[in-house]
């Protein structure tokens, strides 16, 4: 299944706010609960919607999300927490959380167009897994710097998660540590996502 490129507002009306996908918010409580009219949800549907929230927020294909679940299962610790940490430490998500891009799709475009350096080297893979002490900067070109500056000024972050630091212009992002899952910017029950895939295999 390919990455979603359809109407974004349609997704947030059904699933709720997805800040990684779009800055828009459901306009009313009715929008947020658009599907409640269809009656009580089955357990399968509840798990499916949590999975879809995760997939659309982080901009993943179904295959990518399955691979992350498999990696998380093999690691020591809570599968759900490790899954979220893996997704949060993707380069495209780090750029979004720092405010260097307005959304994760916008961050992916920055990376694909080779505007982003990690530790002084161009990285053009949005799924690149960042690690503590990585330093994120833009390429030393006016256009690259302007894209990041415009995003930070247009979409300022009220509070950065504690695993990230953003230094002022010339903007530089620093990864302090692996994210604590309480700082995740999405309301999600990751255990339901793990359960969804457990029942598919």
From Swiss-Prot:
GO terms for cellular component: plastid; small ribosomal subunit. Residues 89-149 form the S4 RNA-binding domain. One of its GO terms (biological process) is ribosomal small subunit biogenesis. Coiled coil: none annotated. The keyword Cytoplasm does not apply. The keyword rRNA-binding applies. It is found in: Plastid. InterPro entries: Ribosomal_uS4, Ribosomal_uS4_bac-type, Ribosomal_uS4_CS, Ribosomal_uS4_N, S4_RNA-bd, S4_RNA-bd_sf. Keywords: Plastid, Ribonucleoprotein, Ribosomal protein, RNA-binding, rRNA-binding. GO terms for molecular function: rRNA binding; structural constituent of ribosome. Belongs to the universal ribosomal protein uS4 family. One of the primary rRNA binding proteins, it binds directly to 16S rRNA where it nucleates assembly of the body of the 30S subunit. Part of the 30S ribosomal subunit. Contacts protein S5. The interaction surface between S4 and S5 is involved in control of translational fidelity. HAMAP family: Ribosomal_uS4_B. This is Small ribosomal subunit protein uS4c. It comes from Cuscuta exaltata (Tall dodder). The lineage of its organism: Eukaryota, Viridiplantae, Streptophyta, Embryophyta, Tracheophyta. The gene is rps4.
């Amino acid at each position: 299944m390919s990455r979603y490129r359809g109407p974004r507002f349609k997704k947030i009306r059904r699933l709720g706010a997805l800040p990684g996908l779009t800055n828009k918010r459901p306009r009313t409580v009715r929008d947020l609960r658009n599907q409640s009219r269809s009656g009580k949800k089955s357990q399968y549907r509840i798990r499916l919607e949590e999975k879809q929230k995760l997939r659309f927020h982080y901009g993943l294909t179904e295959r990518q999300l399955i691979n992350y679940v498999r990696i998380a299962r093999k690691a020591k610790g809570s599968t759900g927490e490790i899954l979220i940490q893996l997704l949060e430490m993707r380069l495209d998500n780090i750029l979004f959380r720092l405010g260097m891009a307005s959304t994760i799709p916008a961050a992916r475009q920055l990376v694909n167009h080779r505007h982003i350096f990690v530790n002084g080297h161009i990285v053009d893979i949005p799924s690149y897994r960042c690690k503590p002490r990585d330093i994120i900067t833009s390429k030393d070109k006016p256009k690259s710097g302007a894209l990041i500056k415009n995003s930070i000024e247009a979409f300022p972050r009220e509070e950065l998660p504690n695993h990230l630091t953003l230094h002022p212009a010339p903007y530089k992002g620093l990864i302090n540590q692996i994210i604590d899952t309480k700082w995740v910017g999405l309301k999600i029950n990751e255990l339901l996502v793990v359960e969804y895939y457990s029942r598919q295999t």
